[in-house]
Amino acid sequence: VATSIDSYTGKPFSGTLNYNVQRLADGTPLTEKFPEADFPFQGISYKAKYRSVSMLDNSILRDLAPENAVEINDLDAKELGLETGDMVRVTSATGSETFGKILARPGVARKTIAVAFGYGHWEYNTNAYQVDGKDVAATSPREVGMNLVKVSLLDPTFGDKMYGLAEMQSGMCARNGGAYRIEKV
């Protein structure tokens, strides 16, 4: 990165470890477009011990951890009147939403939603379909839980084109960060 040029700004990267605020493709800070007062949470996904793409079909591992949770700091949960097990709606700043159960714990950073990936699939045989005229039944355990990717932000600076929020240093889809709110349902 030290010798690379930022493809969005045309300026060189710093070359040293530093903090960069999340920005949209036009350089606007994310919090300028989506104020923290409206969307106070950022999201982070992590790999669960017993759940990944290679383990989705292992029924024993699925039984150990059948669903994930919307994990938030216990102090944030208290401020929102939430308790572990409460069902919530997670809404992104660009309008997509998903649902999950709260897990309140002190090990999550304040104003952060932590979600184990490998859950909440909307494909991977979660829908019935046909192959060569033969019906293939859905395998529902793969759709249990929530998936943070479903509510990833779109970058509104691209107008009517659908373009996901990008991580500025690499240009890849931003899997972490974003702007979200949580509401009890």
Positions of predicted regions on the chain:
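Long, low-complexity segments enriched in small/aliphatic residues
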Residues: 1-60
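Long, contiguous, secondary-structure-rich segments that constitute the structural scaffold
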Residues: 5, 54-71, 75-185
